[in-house]
Amino acid sequence: MAHSVKIYDTCIGCTQCVRACPTDVLEMIPWDGCKASQIASAPRTEDCVGCKRCESACPTDFLSVRVYLGPETTRSMGLAY
């Protein structure tokens, strides 16, 4: 089942989320906005199983990577009533 995976600009390019993902949903891409010159990207969200290991691995105070499961997606994006 595919889940929505969002990468935020608080990403520090550490690769922890990429290494934690058991289904290779995430990858690093070049980005000049951080010291590491790379940022996480989620090109294969259809393979996301919703384990949230990427969230657990993220060392930033505000999670740079978030996985939204089903109804959680619309609620967090302000689309649910």
From Swiss-Prot:
GO terms under biological process: photosynthetic electron transport in photosystem I
PROSITE patterns the record matches: 4FE4S_FER_1, 4FE4S_FER_2
Any matching Pfam family: Fer4_21
Binding site for [4Fe-4S] cluster 2: C21, C48, C51, C54
GO cellular-component term (any): chloroplast thylakoid membrane
Keyword Electron transport carried by entry: yes
E.C. no: 1.97.1.12
Catalytic reaction list: reduced [plastocyanin] + hnu + oxidized [2Fe-2S]-[ferredoxin] = oxidized [plastocyanin] + reduced [2Fe-2S]-[ferredoxin]
Binding positions ([4Fe-4S] cluster 1): C11, C14, C17, C58
Gene3D superfamilies tied to this protein: 3.30.70.20
Cofactor note: Binds 2 [4Fe-4S] clusters. Cluster 2 is most probably the spectroscopically characterized electron acceptor FA and cluster 1 is most probably FB.
UniProt cross-references to SUPFAM superfamilies, sorted A to Z: 4Fe-4S ferredoxins
Protein topology in the membrane: Peripheral membrane protein
GO molecular-function terms, A-Z: 4 iron, 4 sulfur cluster binding; electron transfer activity; metal ion binding; oxidoreductase activity
Domain of life the protein comes from: Eukaryota
Occurrences of domain 4Fe-4S ferredoxin-type (ranges): 2-31, 39-68
Cofactor names: [4Fe-4S] cluster
Compartment(s): Plastid, Chloroplast thylakoid membrane
Function field: Apoprotein for the two 4Fe-4S centers FA and FB of photosystem I (PSI); essential for photochemical activity. FB is the terminal electron acceptor of PSI, donating electrons to ferredoxin. The C-terminus interacts with PsaA/B/D and helps assemble the protein into the PSI complex. Required for binding of PsaD and PsaE to PSI. PSI is a plastocyanin-ferredoxin oxidoreductase, converting photonic excitation into a charge separation, which transfers an electron from the donor P700 chlorophyll pair to the spectroscopically characterized acceptors A0, A1, FX, FA and FB in turn.
NCBIfam families, sorted: PS_I_psaC
Quaternary context: The eukaryotic PSI reaction center is composed of at least 11 subunits.
Listed name of the protein: Photosystem I iron-sulfur center
Organism for this UniProt entry: Zygnema circumcarinatum (Green alga)
Gene: psaC
